[in-house]
């Protein structure tokens, strides 16, 4: 008699590790910027540029980009801003890591703050949480029935067991991976200042974030919708002594190509924020 089997392809977690990373550096104020009297706010973003696996460890390379809003002692205009970066390269212990397999790294910026060393130097400190894992593809043989030797020789598809042999079967639900990919979804839009707001000369500080982010499968694609929240602090034209701010929301709706998918499938989608930029135009 023979055990009939069916092969199932699956991904199993090979290894994983969590750690906290502290980034800290002293940053000089650029020569073109006035002295710092008081720090108002700092905003940081993490950009992971490369992840690679080595034997029993993972290497993460990236940088912390920050924007600092501060108060100066200049009478002409007291509010100023400066930007900077802190590069990092970290080795994470990852037992049983395979150098030939891809490493997946998830990260969160838990804290980012700045302190004043002197009027021309600040200390920037950030805490970054990292979760790294590696998955390996396996092929499993699942038993589907027992057939007699005569049935095997006759190439009969009936899985009825031979006399004297009992079998117990249970249904098992499985899914098949249709697509596994990475892609970029770019949001590029523009908005006008409302009436009553002066024109923008220079952007001092801005914040961009998403709200109500939702994904839905469509035929051969993934639909992404949400709102982009915008806050801008700027100096107006012909009046650099004063400051103006502007807040608004911009809806976005777009489709990322994903060949072979449709709305009846089950999706496992992860969205990671990328680079942000904002500029004023006349």
Pin down the residues of each PLM region.
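Viral structural modules
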Residues: 1-282
């Amino acid at each position: 008699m023979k055990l009939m089997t069916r092969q199932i392809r699956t991904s199993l977690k090979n290894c994983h590790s969590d750690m906290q990373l502290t980034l800290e550096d002293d940053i000089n104020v650029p020569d073109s910027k006035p002295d710092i009297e008081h720090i108002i706010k700092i905003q940081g973003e993490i950009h992971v540029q490369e992840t690679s696996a080595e034997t029993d460890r993972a290497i993460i390379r990236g940088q912390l980009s920050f924007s600092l809003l501060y108060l100066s002692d200049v009478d002409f205009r007291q509010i100023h801003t400066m930007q900077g970066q802190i590069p990092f390269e970290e080795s994470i212990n990852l037992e049983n890591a395979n150098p030939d397999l891809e490493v997946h790294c998830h990260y969160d910026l838990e804290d980012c703050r700045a302190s004043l060393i002197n009027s021309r130097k600040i200390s920037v400190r950030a805490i970054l949480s990292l979760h790294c894992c590696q998955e390996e593809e396996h092929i499993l043989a699942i038993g589907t029935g027992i057939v007699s030797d005569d049935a095997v020789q006759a190439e009969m598809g009936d899985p009825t067991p031979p006399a004297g042999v009992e079998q117990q079967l249970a249904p098992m639900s499985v899914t098949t991976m249709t697509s596994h990919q990475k892609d970029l979804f770019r949001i590029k839009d523009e908005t006008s200042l409302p009436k009553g707001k002066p024109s923008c000369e220079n952007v001092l500080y801005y914040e961009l974030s998403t709200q109500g982010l939702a994904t839905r499968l469509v035929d051969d694609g993934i639909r992404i919708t949400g709102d982009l929240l915008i806050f801008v602090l700027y100096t107006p034209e012909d009046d650099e002594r004063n400051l103006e701010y502007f807040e608004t929301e911009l809806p976005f709706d777009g489709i990322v190509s994903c060949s072979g998918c449709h709305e009846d499938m089950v999706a496992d989608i992860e969205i990671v924020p990328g680079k942000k930029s904002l500029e004023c135009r006349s």
